[in-house]
Amino acid sequence: MTITITNIKRVGSEQTESLTIENGLIKGWNLPAEGEIFDGQGGTLAPALIELHAHLREPGQTEKEDLASGLAAASAGGYGTVVCMPNTRPVIDDPALVRSLIEKARGLGFARLRPAAAVTKGEKGEQLTEMSYLKEAGAVMFTDDGLTNENARVLRLGMEYAKSLGMVISVHAEDDALRAGGVMNEGPVSESLGLPGNPAAAAAARVARDMEIVALTGARLHVQHLSTARELDIVRDAKRRGLPVTCEVCPHHLDLTDESLRTFDAMYKVAPPLRTRADADYLLEGLLDGSVDCIATDHAPHTRAEKERDLLDAPSGIAYIEIAFPIMWTRFGERLGLEKLIDLMTAGPARVMGWPEPSLEAGAPADMVVLDLETEREVNPAEFKSKAKFTPWQGQKLRGFPLLTVVDGKVAYRRE
């Protein structure tokens, strides 16, 4: 199959060029047009984005999302690869389930699926999974995300097992006892609203503990969704000590704060919770100075009925994978710059995983996205590919929407 994308620009260039793709690989730049031709409309060509943290809800919770809707949403957001979390029903802790998900996703024609598998059976925090068989089946990461690895000894054993396989463990780092019952960040806003708070110390204490387990084992650890300044300081210190630690930040922890909860709207309820503007600004500095390795969304869809419940009862999570890049480009593009932002959403995740960094040179795999960096569009969740057709950014005007996403040399998304 041959595709030519015309009328595009490279990152950092104003020159209009074309790119030809053949049999899943980049054939070259500015060659005679052949095959199916797509007009890039003057957009900027970048490697397809990589998502290390998404909840696709299949199997068992497909009323919230499924592989087809979640991967279609990812493709519409410019993503070429998605690592799905294992906190499904049943939990992704069986090699046969890993293989089944990969095979099903392959036939959908959207973003590439790379399943994460659980560290412990059933994510119960007790008995380790058969990590070697899960890796052989295609699992790319181990995590009990959704739970918090309360048992330090089990986490240590899991990290040692993962290390022997050359794999990374990813952690949702919050202390369950400290965060118990909290529905939002503990601070002046929660106090003024009379809502139970989840203190920043719950996240910081768990990250600090986990850094010591890294020091003990020498195993690679990836810390999910930093939300506080103190967590970032702890990770920075671990990196200065030479520990094999990486971390991610989510757009919602940069753009939204606990002030949003003044509406008592559970759409803003996430775990870890939205923190203060000072925390968000500090995390942005971590992106700028390289302390934070990558951006991930923690795409976590729920049904509208669930998110319309009282704050105390509603589940945590925001789903917005198809507008993640526009949020980051519109809100923080001026501070970060395009090259840095693209790196944080492509090469950064690849480095965390130990994958080859994406390339747009001849011979490289044809995973790419054409981005419209200039045109403002109003966010309309009714147009989302995701089943979660609601978002905190509804009605806001953003720039940076994908025009075309190509995965393995095939069109996975094209904006109509």
Curated annotation (Swiss-Prot):
One of its GO terms (biological process) is purine nucleobase catabolic process. Substrate binds at H55, L56, R57, N87, H302. Zn(2+) 2 binds at D145, H172, H225. Gene3D superfamilies: Metal-dependent hydrolases (3.20.20.140), Urease, subunit C, domain 1 (2.30.40.10). InterPro entries: Amidohydro-rel (IPR006680), DHOase (IPR004722), DHOase/Allantoinase_Hydrolase (IPR050138), Dihydroorotase_CS (IPR002195), Metal-dep_hydrolase_composite (IPR011059), Metal_Hydrolase (IPR032466). Pathway: Pyrimidine metabolism; UMP biosynthesis via de novo pathway; (S)-dihydroorotate from bicarbonate: step 3/3. The active site is at D298. The keyword Ribosomal protein does not apply. Zn(2+) 1 binds at H53, H55, D145, D298. Binds 2 Zn(2+) ions per subunit. It comes from the Bacteria. Keywords: Hydrolase, Metal-binding, Pyrimidine biosynthesis, Zinc. GO terms for molecular function: allantoinase activity; dihydroorotase activity; zinc ion binding. PROSITE patterns: DIHYDROOROTASE_2 (PS00483). Pfam families: Amidohydro_1. GO terms for cellular component: cytoplasm. Its cofactor is Zn(2+). It catalyses: (S)-dihydroorotate + H2O = N-carbamoyl-L-aspartate + H(+). Its EC number is 3.5.2.3. Catalyzes the reversible cyclization of carbamoyl aspartate to dihydroorotate. Belongs to the metallo-dependent hydrolases superfamily. DHOase family. Class I DHOase subfamily. This is Dihydroorotase.
